[in-house]
Amino acid sequence: MSRIKRNAVSMACLLALLAACGGSGSDPDVKAGGATPTLLAGSVVTTQEPLVSASRIAGGMAAQEATAGAIPVLLAPSEARSRELSGTVPTAPGVTLAGASRLLSQASMGATMYDIQQVAIKGMVPWLNEQFAMPQLMHRWYIDNAMRKAGVGGWGTQDQFYESFWQQVCTGQDQLRQRVAFGLSQIFVVSFVDDNLGSSGRMMGGYYDMLGKNAFGNFRTLLDDVAHHPAMAIYLSFLRNKMETETRVPDENFARELMQLMTIGLYELNQDGTEKLKNGKPIETYTHDDVAGLAKVFTGWSWAGHDKSNARFFGTIEDPWRDWLPLQNYPNFHSTSTKQVLGRPLTATTAEGELKEALDRLFNHPNVGPFIGRQLIQRMVTSNPSPAYVSRVAAAFNNNGSGVRGDMKAVIKAILLDDEARRPGANAGGRVREPVLRQANWMRAFYASSVSGKYTMWSMDDPVRGLGQSVLRAPSVFNFYRPGYAPPGTALESADMVAPELQIASEPAVVGYLNTMKNAIYNGMGRNYDIRTGYVKELAIVADEDKLVDRLNLLLMAGQMTPTTRAHIRNAVRSIQMPAAWNTDPADISYRRTNRVYLAVYLTMASPEYIIQQ
């Protein structure tokens, strides 16, 4: 066993060096009050879900549109596992299994062997188009049903959101939407860490649903929905924001961050993302007068409802659906003075008109394509895209080929199908996999399922006892890490390169990751180890170390494991001898077989080659 320990320590040290340098038993729930359908794997259920239309509240009850959609089945992990093909897999022209796995590392929450085979068989573009056409399953439906089943009211809990989130990660077939929504959640940040949102599971679930809904839509609609969502209004403090007086100015928080972090950034950019210069200095995109003007646009906005009374504005009337319906404007509290945005006064004469004009102005700013495009590249493909890569993605944002600006499908295709994304070694070092994705990778790669059917997972943002990151629990509006972060005093900084995710890769976090994943691999994750995997496919080949390592290499590293790492892992696995033919002790046989798998998975996920997504 000493060799095993030496290898494990070796991998841990390498990871620390990197940080230093650098089937489901649950039925899918539908809307509250509706029947929970019994679903068979591969089937589709259709339901009616009321969604608020783009036309906002114009007095009276919020206008709603009933949108019918086919809900994708939450494919049971055991069913996905059973669909794996054995033997030679027929692949589409120009696609390899390793290439398919690499696409999934960028475009999903994690690869399964079944998914790898499907991408390889169908081809990358057909798979992307299939993902674009796949309907969305809402977290809010799950939370509503969870409260209904428990016989309680209220606003939902964090735990209920995480149950829904991890259920969708493990079993949802809409993997591209989930990955893009996760990326958007790190640009349009709201957080459970805020005391005012910590007990608002349904509101936050609805916000995440909104990001997912817009993941394949238009960026302009996304801006509108973010600006009207109560979670953002609470988080960046413009809910119940009142017009200016002689002694009071409107809250400027959201106005500032909407420009700085969510649309145009601090400095004017060329299409390739490089800064424009004037007299050798960067050119600021906005002034404080613009912040003050935009802040006045966000006055008078508060809860949706049947009327626009003062009581409803201040929230003393608590309608049961106000936590997810879009805000409405209350003229009694809206500023009527002149509002300057990006150097020019707004011309609209109503609150709704002013907001539309302001968002149009931001949306049409030439910075948006490169500013947002670069961040989405960082969240999916590489931390250091070349200027040419950024320019190509920005061009797709500016015009999808049919004269449409802000088409997210065009942007996503431009990101994922670019040569720098598809050609190994072309993307300047890839990116560090953030902890949430490592956790999701493990769950999906080994077909993890929930014992209870609820996927009871709490937040994992404690860096010592967890993974140092949980979705929707960023410490501030600046996310878990900044897009331009480089570890100080390192070769990365000297090379003018960035590694955003290393901002949370402290020494305790590195050790916490190793300990947490070791425990997960051996025992499972979540409350009472509710989320577990049987490693069925891995145990079937456990006697052949080469086949076992080959499978892990394809699943977790897209075939990019180096010969040195491969030899380390293979030798460590080999040091645990397979049970002899005469061994009839079932406990010893199981121990030897399972520990060979556990060790192989652990060392693979501890290796720097896995931590760095190439």
Which residues does each predicted region cover?
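Flexible, low-complexity segments enriched for small/polar residues
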Residues: 101-108, 149-150, 188, 365-369, ...
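Amphipathic interfacial helices
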Residues: 160-161, 171-179
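Bacterial Sec-dependent N-terminal signal peptides
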Residues: 13, 18-41, 48, 52, ...
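Hydrophobic alpha-helical membrane-insertion signals
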Residues: 94-147
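Short, contiguous, well-structured surface segments enriched in hydrophobic/aromatic residues
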Residues: 174-177, 188-193
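Active-site substrate-binding loop specific to GH73 endo-beta-N-acetylglucosaminidase modules
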Residues: 55, 60-63, 74-82, 116, ...
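Sec-dependent bacterial lipoprotein signal peptides
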Residues: 1-19
